[in-house]
Every structure is written in structure tokens, then in C-alpha cells.
A protein has these predicted regions:
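Short, structured segments at the rim of ligand-binding sites
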Residues: 1-150
Length: 150
């Protein structure tokens, strides 16, 4: 298990953290992802929870949040999540999901191919717009993916 904090370049990029969450969910122990670049970046966590991940929102104790966070701290909402704790290892299970956005879609897909059972994704154009031919590329690496056109 490991902890990461997102940062602006050259730090750990915020775009990596959803995919990283899927990977570290397989690790033994507890890991924390602390998001300091974007507000409300953990929408994907609910999908991973539905697939079996043990994820809980946490609020890190930060002495000077205006200096740590790269967004306007005064704009935050009570429902905003700034970090999650992932307790592993996780054995992801399948499900049916409508992909809400690019990063959540790639995260669900990664969890699905690393887990057990059948997963059905709709609204996959969200994934396609950022990952060209991802199904073919992952299939060439041994993933079992079948694209069905409606």
C-alpha cells in the first residue's frame, strides 16, 4: 500500500489518480489518495465501491489549505471530498455501469479487466474520446473485451 498526493506538473498528476486507485485497491493494506489540484475529483470511487472496493472519504488535516490546494479553497462545498482511503486487497466483481466521463470510464474498465465476472459498460464513447482503440489494445495484452454495437 502507498499514499499519494496529486500536484501540478511535475508532481503526481490528478489525471492519474483514478487509475492509480484501481491499482492500489489490489495492494495489501491501506492507501490514501489526497487530491490537491481539482475539486470533487472522486466521483469514480462509487463505481469502484460497487465493484467491491473498500473506499472511504477522509478529510486530511491541512494547516494552511489555501497554500496546499490549487483551487479556490473558499469555493469548496461541504460535500466535496479531498481524499480517499482504500483498504485492500480488493477482488473486483462485475456489474453494469453507464460511463459518466473519460477518467471514470477508464477506471471502471481497468477494474473490470483486473477482476472477476462480467461487466457491461454503456456510454463508452466517453472512453473512446480519450483512449483510441483501447479495447483492441487491451485485448492484445490478454484482456477479454467484447464490444457490442447497439
Amino acid at each position: 500500500a502507498t499514499d499519494v498526493t496529486t500536484e501540478i506538473h511535475p508532481g503526481f498528476m490528478t489525471d492519474w489518480q483514478p487509475l492509480w486507485a484501481t491499482l492500489i485497491a489490489h495492494a495489501e493494506g491501506s492507501s490514501i489518495i489526497h487530491e490537491t489540484v481539482m475539486q470533487n475529483r472522486f466521483q469514480y470511487a462509487q463505481f469502484l465501491k460497487e465493484m467491491g472496493a473498500d473506499i472511504e472519504p477522509i478529510e486530511p488535516q491541512v494547516k494552511h489549505p489555501q497554500k496546499v490546494y490549487n483551487f479556490n479553497w473558499e469555493d469548496r462545498q461541504p460535500s466535496d471530498i479531498h481524499a480517499i482511503k482504500i483498504n485492500g486487497p480488493t477482488e473486483f466483481t462485475g456489474g453494469e455501469f453507464c460511463v459518466p466521463d473519460l477518467r471514470a470510464g477508464a477506471t471502471i474498465l481497468l477494474a473490470a479487466i483486473s477482476g472477476q465476472g462480467k461487466t457491461v459498460l454503456t456510454n463508452i464513447n466517453q472512453i473512446d474520446r480519450g483512449y483510441e482503440n483501447i479495447d483492441q489494445k487491451l485485448t492484445s495484452l490478454g484482456a477479454k473485451i467484447k464490444r457490442v454495437e447497439n
